[in-house]
Amino acid sequence: MANRPNGAVRRRAGPFLALLAGAFAAVAPATIDAAPRIVSLDQCADQYVLALAPRDEIAFVSKRALNADSNQRSRAVGLPEHRATLETVLGARASIAVRYWTPDARLPDALRRQGVEVVQLDEANDFAGIRANVRKVAAVLDERATGEALIDKMDAKLAASRGAWGGARALYLTPGGFTAGRDTLVAAMMGAAGLVTAAAGVGYRPVSLEQLVLDPPSALVLGFFRDLAGGRQRWTIGGNSYLRGLAARRTLVSLPGSQLGCPAWYAADGVLAMARAGQVR
């Protein structure tokens, strides 16, 4: 028993050990049970965080959370906004970061090395992909019921829209002169309303004015025209008399960026808008 401290040492150490134990008792539960601090690193991540996370757990949103094309912008009012950097995320003491795309591709790994859990949203070209994204984020945030409620609302709108256009063909068109072929979320949205994209090929691609003049589409679905009018586009309908006439005669619906900009559950709002246009034609 030579290594056992004598009574005097134990008596002197007693108050210190009691104080230390009390400190751990006070701090440990707060550390273990503390609510997560959640940040969103870009505008698409904003939508998921704002819809799924409790407001008091959101440390900050992106600098684009209040933009006109941010679907959940009303929920972002009053929340801190920051550009996504290693310094801002660590400075916010974030425990969870949600990301779709950021200019710095190294940021997710840098955050993980610092102990931040990074939830990466996947590119979703259909509604199954959107369901998977909602469930992924909801699971990490421990908000599964909220996530399922979003999915249920989305699916109800899709069910109400099904087959509205009966297979009619339409060309999707943006102010920058792009259209959507197969394997795009826009094509999936059109298909959910009973439309077939008139664009050949796969993915998003430019369409020329000459093509529109020589082979005019029987119907148009416009996207982003409410949000992106102005000089940033290569061409616009407003700047061309032929296109103005074509749009006036053949536009089925004009969808805002707040329904198109991110692969999220509210894409079903755009589907429903297309379907309703078909129901009143």
Regions found by a protein language model. Name each.
Residues 36-37, 128-139, 148, 165, ...:
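Structured C-terminal subdomain patch of bacterial secreted/periplasmic proteins
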Residues 42, 101, 202, 223-227, ...:
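Short secondary-structure boundary segments
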Residues 63-67, 75-78, 180-205:
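Alpha-helical, coiled-coil/dimerization segments enriched in small aliphatic residues
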Residues 36-102, 201, 240:
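A short, structured surface patch at a secondary-structure boundary
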Residues 36-49, 144-195:
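Basic- and aromatic-lined ligand-binding clefts that recognize polyanionic substrates
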Residues 15-28:
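Bacterial N-terminal signal peptides
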Residues 1-11:
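N-terminal secretory signal peptides that target proteins for export/translocation
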Residues 106, 122-136, 169-185, 228-231:
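Extracytoplasmic ligand-binding site segments that recognize negatively charged/polar headgroups
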